[in-house]
């Protein structure tokens, strides 16, 4: 009974975090992230309702660089759209946090979760708290002298969300999934760890690309212009200033994509070699997800970052990570 409660709670929490990640990505892609220029964790629970209230919020927005440099011709109706998108993102963050924290407190005091097993849940709780601050810290960077947020802060904001999901999903499969009765698979465990690491790096690079609008600089594949290494960075490939260069970031994200494919291709081969029915099914599922991820990534580049495809690309990255976390769980406990 208690096990089922924990499983349902973790499943819902995982879904909510995924929604947060996707809506956060859409917020970034639509340029809505800087539309709310204040951080009001308690008083900001309701959007403006009256015309006067909307005018007040619009006036606040006009005082900051994004309006003055980019959206100076935006109408009130257009402002309402981006404002409500950012509002939904923040509201969903509050709801997700409550969905996680309230049952956790109840489970702890009722003894449903034993004290010796609380550590990962406490870490996730702390990350939820840090995430709220990190979100505002990111937004604040776009309200100073720049009309866009720091791509580094954006990347860390995303990675914290992914780590939260990772912790919750791992606890979910520990509660729900059966172990495999197979011999120890150290090689598969090692490749699972490598794959998780490479996917994390690729997600981080993807956030840097999004933060710099780097998906727009080259729109052909597999080359960038007429070269594999774009001409702009050929002479200074290892310069630290490249971390602020959209061309370099798109190049690194492409390299990351090749790395993710290579590592997971090896993992798929290893899964087939075990000749276990469930691992074979996982291998086929991994192939499908990997191909979808590659296809959506290429389409995102070639068609100048269409919002729907880019959002699917981000979602599939989380699914890919989930499969590898599942593999890690199976091989760690084999």
Curated annotation (Swiss-Prot):
UniProt membrane topology term: Multi-pass membrane protein
Protein name as annotated: Heme A synthase
Originating organism: Rickettsia prowazekii (strain Madrid E)
Location of the protein in the cell: Cell membrane
UniProt keyword list: Cell membrane, Heme biosynthesis, Iron, Membrane, Metal-binding, Oxidoreductase, Transmembrane, Transmembrane helix
Record's keyword annotation contains Plastid: no
Family: Belongs to the COX15/CtaA family. Type 2 subfamily.
Positions with a binding annotation for heme: 253, 313
Subunit structure comment from the entry: Interacts with CtaB.
Gene Ontology MF terms in the entry: metal ion binding; oxidoreductase activity, acting on NAD(P)H, heme protein as acceptor
Domain of life: Bacteria
GO BP annotation list: heme A biosynthetic process
InterPro entries: COX15/CtaA_fam, HemeA_Synthase_type2
Catalytic activity reported: Fe(II)-heme o + 2 A + H2O = Fe(II)-heme a + 2 AH2
Pfam families: COX15-CtaA
Transmembrane regions: 6-26, 93-113, 119-139, 154-174, 189-209, 255-275, 282-302, 305-325
GO annotation, cellular component aspect: plasma membrane
Named cofactor requirement(s): heme b
Function, in words: Catalyzes the conversion of heme O to heme A by two successive hydroxylations of the methyl group at C8. The first hydroxylation forms heme I, the second hydroxylation results in an unstable dihydroxymethyl group, which spontaneously dehydrates, resulting in the formyl group of heme A.
EC assignment: 1.17.99.9
Pathway: Porphyrin-containing compound metabolism; heme A biosynthesis; heme A from heme O: step 1/1
Disulfide bond residue pairs: none
């Amino acid at each position: 009974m208690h096990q089922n409660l924990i499983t349902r709670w973790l499943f819902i929490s995982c879904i909510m975090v995924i929604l947060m990640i996707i809506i956060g990505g859409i917020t970034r892609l639509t340029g809505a992230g800087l539309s709310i220029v204040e951080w009001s964790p308690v008083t900001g629970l309701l959007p403006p309702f009256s015309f006067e209230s909307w005018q007040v919020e619009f006036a606040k927005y006009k005082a900051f660089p994004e309006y003055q440099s980019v959206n100076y011709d935006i109408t009130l109706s257009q402002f309402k759209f981006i404002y409500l998108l950012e509002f939904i993102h923040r509201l969903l963050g509050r709801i997700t946090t409550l969905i996680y924290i309230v049952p956790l407190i109840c489970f702890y005091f009722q003894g449903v979760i034993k004290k010796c097993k609380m550590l990962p849940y406490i870490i996730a709780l702390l990350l939820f708290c840090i995430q709220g601050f990190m979100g505002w810290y990111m937004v604040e960077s776009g309200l100073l002298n720049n009309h866009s947020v720091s791509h580094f802060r954006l990347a860390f904001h995303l990675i914290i969300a992914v780590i939260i999901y990772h912790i919750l999903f791992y606890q979910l499969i520990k509660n729900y999934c059966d172990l495999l009765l197979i011999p120890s698979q150290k090689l598969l465990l090692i490749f699972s760890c490598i794959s998780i690491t490479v996917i994390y790096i690729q997600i981080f690079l993807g956030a840097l690309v999004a933060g710099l609008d780097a998906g727009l600089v080259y729109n052909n594949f597999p080359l960038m212009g007429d070269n594999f290494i774009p001409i702009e960075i050929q002479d200074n490939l290892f310069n630290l200033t490249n971390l602020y260069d959209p061309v370099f970031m798109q190049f690194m994200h492409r390299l990351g994509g090749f790395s993710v494919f290579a590592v997971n291709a090896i993992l798929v081969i290893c899964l087939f070699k075990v000749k276990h029915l469930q691992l074979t099914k996982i291998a086929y599922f991994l192939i499908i997800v990997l191909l979808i991820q590659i296809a959506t990534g290429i389409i995102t580049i070639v068609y100048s970052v269409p919002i729907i495809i880019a959002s699917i690309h981000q979602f599939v990255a989380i699914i890919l990570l989930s499969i590898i976390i599942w593999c890690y769980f199976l091989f760690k406990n084999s």
